[in-house]
């Protein structure tokens, strides 16, 4: 489901990676743990695109909470912790289409 949303926004995500981080990525998740999803690139994702993706994630039919974070705008300590055990779930280069 989450990967499907990222595919819908592939052109907006060009040049960015989307990662799963937190307890789901590190293997410490409990049954109802949330999904921490981050986006990172050379530049922050344009705010309009960020919120369009967030709205689509919120519309997913799931009982799980999904936290959507622009890691470019996160505190350096959070960004580093997130990326230490992150799993890339979507990636596209600037020139991919």
Predicted regions and their residues:
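Glycine-rich beta-strand-to-loop/alpha-helix junction loops that act as flexible
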Residues: 21-23
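ATP/adenylate-binding site constellation spanning eukaryotic-like Ser/Thr protein kinases
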Residues: 34
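Catalytic core of pol beta-like nucleotidyltransferases
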Residues: 1-17, 26-31, 40-97
């Amino acid at each position: 489901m989450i990967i499907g949303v990222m595919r819908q926004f592939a052109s907006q995500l060009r040049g960015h990676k989307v990662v799963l981080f937190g307890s789901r990525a590190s293997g410490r998740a409990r049954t109802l743990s949330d999904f921490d999803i981050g986006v990172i690139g050379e530049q922050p994702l344009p705010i309009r695109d960020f919120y369009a993706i967030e709205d689509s994630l919120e519309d997913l039919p799931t009982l799980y909470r999904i936290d959507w974070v622009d890691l470019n705008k996160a505190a350096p300590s959070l960004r580093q912790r997130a990326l230490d055990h992150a799993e890339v779930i979507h990636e596209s280069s600037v020139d991919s289409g």
